[in-house]
């Protein structure tokens, strides 16, 4: 039987994992990457490319290595927990080499259009027109996986800032920022307090005369380094913690989180406290920002009302003169210009079943991969989406009726609207564990903690109490990986390894305390398992 051919659009992280998912399901992937290399967002370049997100030279990823790795390919133990962008890209290269993925990629090839075949209602096939070196080519595919991400088009709302056209200094979007060298001795305004805005404020303040961080709403600032030096996302991403938070509800969870955040520094005193709750925004992670603020090198300001030739006037009436540069860290928008009307994006909103499948197609042969902004790592979600999509393409899984899918899409959108502050930034939000467990159920790889409690209690304990890493979804079901158990049980070793650069005598009291703690947890384990289910 002839293998089904699947077009994979984009050679970034979602594209790489999608290629591998196709191969694992016996499909034939052909990946189109318009640049000459893999990596997508994580491939640093001095000169930004149109239609592709661009990172600055110093970017450190916000999710730790255990939470962001591919499910059957742990990141090397000597790599730091939070990696520089060059190390992230190197990991992707290692992954592509390990699973021989590059042979499926056609580099320097742009996808011009993706259209239904005339007999789409029965065949589900697509006509894909591509261009390479000035030559266009049309091929027919049995399925399409769109892996172009959501950091594609810089969102630059200049119309919201009267007078900017008169401003004599330089102004640009954060995608065009590369390093702080050109800002020595200057007075700089950063507009926006997302992750890019916070990072740029910190970095530029090391050379600038003064940095002003302008924010409309304020933000809750989380840090990468959590209690006892563990990565914060590792500490907050266990199934048990997630279960407890579900029981407590959003109100108590917000109260606890805000108290913990304010113990680090008082957000009201630092001028950052927003009106919304901590879990009503996509997290802004920055370990250094409070230090720059308390040192006076970064000053927090409200929203800019208008610009003059050399100054910024803020909504509270205050004014800052002699401004040399304005950087708009105002995020991105996304679209799919090569797709026909079957997929529409309106104000950064898109209707997708489980954030993957358009509900209005006669045949489920088009999947959007990685179009989610999770409270956690996106890589493992993209991978699980790919595993599910390829099962659907192959006919191993089916989708509900169009009406059922539309009803669920509406419900999911209502939940987003209810929880999050209205913002272009929050249109594709999703909780990490909820999303992973939901996708794992669809794929058939969610670990059965109840059965494992009797057959492998040690592993079950780690699955419940430890961080919910991507490797959990290789323990059972399709695509099971023989190395999953060992990798899960050695998670803590990989976290500690890069920090062990000096021999330190371990406290005996700490060791005994940990032993007692583990014993108590073991005693309560079966009760917890039963409660969880």
Swiss-Prot record:
Catalyzed reactions per annotation: N,N-dimethylaniline + NADPH + O2 + H(+) = N,N-dimethylaniline N-oxide + NADP(+) + H2O; NADPH + O2 + H(+) = H2O2 + NADP(+); heptan-2-one + NADPH + O2 + H(+) = pentyl acetate + NADP(+) + H2O; octan-3-one + NADPH + O2 + H(+) = pentyl propanoate + NADP(+) + H2O
Gene Ontology CC terms, in alphabetical order: cytosol; endoplasmic reticulum; endoplasmic reticulum membrane
Primary subcellular site in the record, as a coarse category: membrane
Membrane-spanning residues: 513-533
GO biological-process terms attached to the record: lipid metabolic process; regulation of cholesterol metabolic process; xenobiotic metabolic process
Protein function: Acts as a Baeyer-Villiger monooxygenase on a broad range of substrates. Catalyzes the insertion of an oxygen atom into a carbon-carbon bond adjacent to a carbonyl, which converts ketones to esters. Active on diverse carbonyl compounds, whereas soft nucleophiles are mostly non- or poorly reactive. In contrast with other forms of FMO it is non- or poorly active on 'classical' substrates such as drugs, pesticides, and dietary components containing soft nucleophilic heteroatoms. Able to oxidize drug molecules bearing a carbonyl group on an aliphatic chain, such as nabumetone and pentoxifylline.
Domain of life assignment: Eukaryota
Gene that specifies this protein: FMO5
Subcellular location: Microsome membrane; Endoplasmic reticulum membrane
Chain sites annotated for binding NADP(+): 196-199
Enzyme class: oxidoreductase
Positions contributing to FAD binding: 10-14, 33, 41-42, 62-63
Residues carrying Dimethylated arginine: 5
Protein name as annotated: Flavin-containing monooxygenase 5
GO molecular function, one term: flavin adenine dinucleotide binding
Recorded family membership: Belongs to the FMO family.
EC numbers on record: 1.14.13.-, 1.14.13.8, 1.6.3.1
Phosphoserine sites (modified residues): 54, 58, 280, 401
Required cofactor names: FAD
């Amino acid at each position: 039987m002839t293998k089904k051919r699947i077009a994979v659009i984009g050679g970034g992280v979602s594209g790489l994992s999608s290629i591998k998912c196709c191969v694992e399901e016996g499909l034939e992937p052909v990946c189109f990457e318009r640049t000459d290399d893999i990596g997508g967002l994580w491939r640093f370049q001095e000169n930004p490319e149109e239609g592709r997100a661009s990172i600055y030279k110093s970017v450190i990823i916000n999710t730790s290595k255990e939470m962001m790795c591919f499910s059957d390919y742990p990141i090397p133990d000597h790599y730091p927990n939070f990696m520089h962008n060059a190390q992230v890209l190197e990991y992707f290269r290692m992954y592509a080499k390990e699973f021989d993925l590059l042979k499926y990629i056609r580099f320097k090839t742009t996808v011009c259009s993706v259209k239904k075949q005339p007999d789409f209602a029965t065949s589900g096939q697509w006509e894909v027109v591509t261009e390479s070196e000035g030559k266009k080519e049309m091929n027919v595919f049995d399925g399409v996986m769109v892996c172009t991400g959501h950091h594609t088009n810089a969102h630059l709302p200049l119309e919201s800032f009267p007078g900017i056209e008169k401003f004599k200094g330089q102004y640009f979007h954060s995608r065009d920022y590369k390093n702080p060298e050109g800002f020595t001795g200057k007075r700089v305004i950063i507009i926006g307090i997302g992750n890019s805005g916070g990072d740029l404020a910190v970095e530029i303040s090391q050379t600038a005369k003064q940095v002003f961080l302008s924010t409309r709403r304020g933000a809750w600032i989380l840090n990468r380094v959590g209690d006892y030096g563990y990565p914060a996302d590792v500490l907050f991403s266990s199934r048990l913690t997630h279960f407890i938070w579900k029981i407590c509800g959003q109100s108590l969870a917000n109260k606890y989180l805000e108290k913990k955040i304010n113990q680090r520094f008082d957000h009201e005193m630092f001028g950052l406290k927003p009106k919304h709750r901590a879990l009503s925004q996509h997290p802004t992670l920055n370990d250094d920002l409070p230090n720059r603020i308390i040192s006076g090198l970064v000053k927090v300001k409200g929203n800019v009302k208008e610009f003059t030739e050399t100054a910024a006037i803020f909504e509270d009436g205050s004014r800052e003169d002699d401004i040399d540069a304005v950087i708009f860290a105002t995020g991105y928008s996304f679209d799919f210009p090569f797709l026909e009307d079957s997929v529409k994006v309106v104000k950064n909103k898109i209707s997708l079943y489980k954030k993957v499948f358009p509900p209005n197609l006669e045949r489920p042969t088009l999947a959007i991969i990685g179009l989610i902004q999770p409270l956690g790592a996106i890589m493992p979600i993209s991978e699980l989406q790919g595993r599910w999509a390829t099962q659907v393409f192959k006919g191993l899984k089916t989708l509900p009726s169009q009406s059922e899918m539309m009803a669920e899409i509406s419900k999911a959108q209502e939940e987003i609207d209810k929880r999050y502050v209205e913002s272009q930034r929050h249109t594709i939000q999703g909780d990490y564990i909820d999303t992973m467990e939901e996708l794992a159920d669809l794929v058939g790889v969610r670990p059965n903690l109840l059965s494992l409690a009797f057959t492998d209690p040690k592993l079950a304990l780690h699955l419940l109490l430890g961080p919910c890493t991507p490797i959990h979804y290789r323990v059972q079901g399709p695509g099971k990986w023989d190395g999953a158990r060992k990798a899960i049980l050695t998670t803590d070793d990989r976290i500690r390894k890069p920090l062990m650069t000096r021999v330190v005598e371990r406290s005996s009291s700490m060791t005994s305390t940990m032993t007692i703690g583990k014993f108590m947890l073991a005693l309560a384990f079966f009760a917890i398992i039963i409660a969880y289910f």
